[in-house]
């Protein structure tokens, strides 16, 4: 049985997910072996724009700064105290300058999609 865990973003290893003209970093806080149902982590966006089609349902909640997401011709600016729900299959562009947390379901989406 899993235990309750306190996760501090300062203790995680962030990997690069985007580059020039800005940078983007992502740190997964729980691995699929801990929770295959949910993936959680932190991300820091520093002006990068990353295009993606999500293969999972996702919630993004902003801790500091302004996270930007463009989807279906609409641009969303998400600020501290706000969150954004993104349904599976959405084609989007992540952007902005922000530290944010994320939750994805299913957490083992890479395994499911053979990635």
Please identify what each model-predicted range represents.
Residues 33-54, 87:
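Conserved short histidine dyad/triad with adjacent acidic residue
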């Amino acid at each position: 049985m899993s235990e309750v865990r306190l996760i501090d973003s300062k203790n995680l290893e962030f990997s690069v997910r985007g580059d020039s003209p800005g940078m983007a970093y992502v740190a997964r806080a729980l691995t699929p072996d801990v929770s295959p149902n949910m993936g959680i982590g932190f991300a820091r966006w520093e002006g990068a724009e990353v295009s993606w089609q999500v293969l999972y349902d996702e919630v993004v909640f902003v801790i500091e700064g302004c996270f930007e997401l463009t989807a279906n011709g609409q641009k969303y600016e998400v600020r501290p105290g706000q969150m954004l729900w993104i349904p599976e299959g959405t084609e989007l562009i992540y952007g902005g300058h922000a530290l944010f947390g994320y939750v994805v379901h299913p957490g083992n989406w890479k395994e499911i999609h053979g990635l």
